[in-house]
Regions:
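Flexible phosphate-sensing "switch/lid" loops adjacent to ATP/NTP-binding sites
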Residues: 2, 6-157, 161-167, 172-285, ...
Length: 310
């Protein structure tokens, strides 16, 4: 939930504009048959369906595919790298919430979240990534408390005083903001952000408030099956519905919970189009968010200095 994926998308677009062929390699999410998943390549939405991706995997892969960037994942990360090297000039390691890069990189960009000040020095592997970084992106400065931004900046500098620090906003985009105004809404956020990410809300909640929803309805009375179990395990989740989908049963429970909810519409802050995998009986507005650097240097400045135009 810090903004790693949107940062990777921004980096990939810059590198492509510079003339480079780019692929993203995601850290492992081994939910299925690990033998079949030795090397996975995703270039189309059909690839996601054929390889039986979970919602969590789709949340990471779909935005890259939307931008025309090939995604690799799987189990054998040397074999994955060797295949990616055959078709691209630059590999982007897209991960970090559960690990640090499996590859020795030429440039390490680490995202810090001022909505969770202190996590950058108190959590593993975040603290390790801080020490390895060449560049920090302090994201969401447009919605964080100024004192928290300062605290994160000071913490990063104390652990890694030579790294460059970029501040960035995370502006929200909704297809029809007026559709939200005055409505009773169900807010959905990506599951990992709310659960092991420890966030109480995400982009969907911010958009619902910003665009004038009359009420954010508590989804818990409408929850079924595994969604009930998720709320018990992560009670801080509160009035937001986590888009849990680690298997077919969970996806069905998510669909039933959404369709049970007595609301006017759904505001979805997940990075994917949920309607591709579930049938929803009420209107849905997707919230999109991109990285917007503030001031200089920008990521483009740093990437051009490091790699130059092809």
């Amino acid at each position: 939930g810090s903004g790693k994926s949107q940062t990777t998308r921004r980096v990939s677009l810059i590198l492509r504009d510079m003339g480079y062929r780019v692929a993203a390699i995601r850290h492992p999410m081994p939910y299925g048959n690990l033998v079949k998943q030795k090397v996975q390549r995703f270039a189309t939405y059909d690839d996601l369906t054929k390889q039986e991706c979970t919602i969590e995997e789709r949340e990471e892969y779909e935005p890259h595919i939307d931008n025309g960037v090939i995604v690799y994942a799987g189990v054998d990360y040397e074999a994955i790298l060797r295949q990616a090297e055959q078709e691209v000039d630059i590999v982007l390691w897209d991960g970090g919430n559960n690990d640090f890069s499996f590859y020795v990189s030429d440039l390490s960009i680490v995202v810090a979240d001022p909505h969770r000040p202190g996590h950058e020095v108190s959590f593993h592997p975040g603290e390790t990534n801080v020490r390895l970084a060449d560049v920090f992106v302090i994201n969401k400065v447009d919605t964080a408390l100024p004192e928290n931004v300062i605290s994160v900046r000071d913490n990063l500098h104390s652990l890694n005083p030579t790294a460059t620090i970029i501040e960035a906003a995370s502006p929200l985009f909704v297809d029809d903001p007026e559709a939200i105004r005055g409505k009773r809404v169900l807010v959905i956020e990506d599951g990992p952000t709310l659960t092991h990410g420890g966030m109480a809300y995400g982009a969907g909640w911010v958009a619902a408030r910003r665009f004038g929803a009359a009420e954010i309805v508590d989804p818990r009375p409408f929850a079924v099956g595994s969604i009930i179990d998720t709320y018990r395990k992560y009670p801080k989740t509160g009035t937001i519905l986590p888009a849990m989908g680690y298997g077919d049963e969970m996806v069905k429970d998510l669909e039933k919970t959404i369709n049970n909810a007595k609301v006017d519409m759904v505001v979805s802050g997940t990075p994917i189009d949920l309607t591709r995998i579930i049938k929803v009986n009420k209107p849905m507005q997707r919230v999109r968010y991109e990285l917007q650097e503030i001031g200089k240097p920008t990521l483009e400045d740093i990437l051009k200095q490091k790699f130059g135009k092809k």
